[in-house]
Amino acid sequence: MQVKGVGQHHLRIGAAQLLSADALDRGCCSYGHEARGVDHAVGRMEASRTGLGMGTAMQQFELEWSSSAQHPKAVQLSPYGEAQDGSRTQALMLSWWPDLAGSWIFYTTLPLWPGITPRFERIARFAPVIGLFIGGAQAALWLLGRQLGLPSTSCALLVLTLGLWLSGGLHLDGVMDTGDGLAAGPRRLAAMADSRIGASGLVAGLMVLLLKVGALLALAVLAPTLLIWSAVWGRVAPLLAIAWFPYLRAEVSGGFHRQHRQPLLQELLPAAAVLGLLIGLSLSPPATRTVLAGLCGVIPTLLVPRLIGKRLGGHTGDSYGACVEWTEAFSLWSGWLMLRLLS
């Protein structure tokens, strides 16, 4: 078994002295003897174990050493860093908050929540929750605009502007960069990394916006509901891209999504909770067809990341953003098509 320190964690020795996690590379039994007379130490360590036919499994442990014990006491931690005991569910829920706060900071332009330190390694799984918020804000603005007598075209433009403001244009920028890359052939990665927008990228961005405006006008009174569904589906699509395809620019910071990912089913848990909430809120018979229209968004959610990934040979941070925007647009249209079939 190979034992190493976890990230930037340190080992607390006595009341004040700290031993760097780098020193833990020498093993879990030796570090106590290097404590220079301090008789107690507690810290976190990570063990990588190779099982038969199962590859390498990463586990976290909390170690406690004292001079009276021959070996450190190890308590296995869950993948989220909390002890695996009867309170695991509660600990798991509490450990989600820093990731959700990190997702809030990364995917929106809104300020950080007070009292929570964000964590960014696994923020992608909470993107659908952010989508629920953004889609809900857009739906509320649509309803307010209609209540004030604004025409549908004005409402459509307003809600798209709100979405761009809340996201900082992060995903639309990915659409344009990916459009340039897809048109550049073998130089696609260089074209996507270029901060200048080419003709293909500009056309791709306009296409996405026009598709959304057209779909919202076609949906009319059901536009607010489908706005929420599409915003959630759009942020599920990158999770599939992360799971299915390699990251093409590992040296770029966007690769941390894939580096820190867990099995796909675990990554989809927040999305499943959001989708279950949307279904539960629409179970009354008059809204059944709306639920079916919303669920149609699963089709572009499955297709868009696969099609883009096959064209590029993998994904980048830009193509993750493109997956969000194209999936949103096609989710709106697939919902409209389902409503037409049911009418």
Where are these regions (language model features)?
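Alpha-helix boundary/capping motif
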Residues: 3-5, 9-11, 18, 23-26, ...
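Short polybasic linear motifs
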Residues: 49, 74
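Low-complexity, intrinsically disordered Ser/Thr/Pro- and acidic-rich segments
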Residues: 50-56, 88
